[in-house]
From Swiss-Prot:
Domain ABC transporter: residue ranges: 2-230
The encoding gene: thiQ
Quaternary structure note: The complex is composed of two ATP-binding proteins (ThiQ), two transmembrane proteins (ThiP) and a solute-binding protein (ThiB).
SUPFAM superfamilies from the UniProt entry: P-loop containing nucleoside triphosphate hydrolases
Entry EC number(s): 7.6.2.15
GO CC annotations on file: plasma membrane
Protein function: Part of the ABC transporter complex ThiBPQ involved in thiamine import. Responsible for energy coupling to the transport system.
Protein name: Thiamine import ATP-binding protein ThiQ
Chain segments annotated as transmembrane: none
Catalytic activity: thiamine(out) + ATP + H2O = thiamine(in) + ADP + phosphate + H(+)
Length: 231
């Protein structure tokens, strides 16, 4: 279980409060206006921002003393963070060994991960040769190799067209179900939230609200969400 316990995050004049729980294996959408703090929330969970107050707990353990690399978290950004001068195999290998000291078993795992996301045979290709959808699949494969139980998605598929984005969300859902990962996904698109998540966190007006059932939240949106969605 991931628990945000009376969390307060400060960045200059901006503050964000959160008190929420995500069950192990749950998929949760995070939605709200631009600048509301959605990415800030994910960065705090990943360990890149220290909360001013409160705790972030995973399975009852306080993650506060742990740096980003020590947390059981993988974070995917919109730009995918693939190194253009490295092959896909090397980019994925960084998820296993930052020094790229890869044994035969590691190389086999990389090949399996590429096959799982539909990129079999492209291990020697560099990111510049790939489409946006293929780059998203490669970044997802790297997260899969890290095998962390918490997966944070900061709009990694926002630049894709509707069909490719739906395909990627379906793939993430499949992998999360297979691995039991807890997934928090930032999105601006209500349809993505409906398609992907049973519950949704609304981030607005300096608060990350407790997760609500997605269908019910959009059927009867609170004022902040109604203002965001528009008429």
């Amino acid at each position: 279980m991931l628990h945000l316990d009376r969390l307060l995050i400060r960045q200059g004049d901006f503050t964000l409060r959160a008190d929420a729980t995500a069950c192990a294996g749950e998929r949760i959408a995070v939605i709200g206006p631009s600048g509301g703090g959605k990415s800030t929330l994910l960065m705090a969970i990943a360990g890149f921002l220290a909360p001013a107050e409160g705790r972030i707990l995973w399975q009852g353990r306080d993650l506060g003393p742990l740096g980003p690399g020590e947390r059981q978290v993988s974070l995917l950004f919109q730009d995918q963070n693939l190194f253009p001068h490295l092959t896909l195999r090397e980019n994925l290998g960084l998820g296993i060994s930052p020094a790229l000291r890869l044994a035969a078993g590691d190389r086999a795992r990389i090949a399996e991960a590429l096959e799982r996301v539909g990129l079999a045979g492209l291990g020697e290709a560099k990111p510049g040769r790939l489409s946006g959808g293929q780059q998203g699949r490669a970044a997802l494969a790297r997260a899969l190799l890290r095998a962390r139980p918490i997966l944070l998605l900061d709009e990694p598929f926002a630049a894709l067209g509707p069909a490719l984005k739906a395909e990627m969300l379906a793939l993430v859902s499949e992998i999360a179900a297979e691995t039991g990962a807890t997934v928090l996904m930032v999105t601006h698109d209500p349809e993505d939230a409906r398609r992907f998540a049973h519950r949704t966190i609304l981030v607005a007006d300096g608060r990350a609200e407790a997760p609500q059932p997605t269908a019910a939240l959009f059927a009867d949106p609170p004022p902040a969400l109604r203002a965001y969605l528009g008429p």
